[in-house]
Amino acid sequence: MDCARSYDLIVNIHPTTIPDMYALAKEMPGLKLVWAHLSGYGGFKDHIEILRRYENVYFDISAHGTDTVGTLRETIDQVGYDRLLFGTDYPGVGPASDIAAVLFEPLTETEREAIFCGNARRLLGIST
């Protein structure tokens, strides 16, 4: 992880336990971490708290991330949309439900654009 941080790399991690997530985010503040599944594997409220505490943490919304209507809107209302990334869990789960979650939640076009591509561009350093 030190090597990834020193080269300004992004580390995409499948969720494990909440204590492990907190520990890694705290111990590696300069490391860009992307966790899969916003509300799955450990609990939505814990993930919101991680986003609130650690600016180096991003979540993708794949598969278990938005399987409950209102999860995405509630997340944005609590911590903003700037560290939420569109993702799919393909081939485990097809992308249709993840796309629908963003399209059918009550989001602004700015929020949708950021989640679908703007946040990833910024994280990856890709200019528009």
Model regions and ranges:
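Aromatic-enriched hydrophobic runs in primary sequence
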Residues: 74-78, 89, 117-119
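Mid-to-C-terminal alpha-helical segments outside catalytic/metal-binding sites
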Residues: 81-83, 96-128
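C-terminal active-site rim and adjoining tail of enzyme catalytic domains
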Residues: 87-91, 95
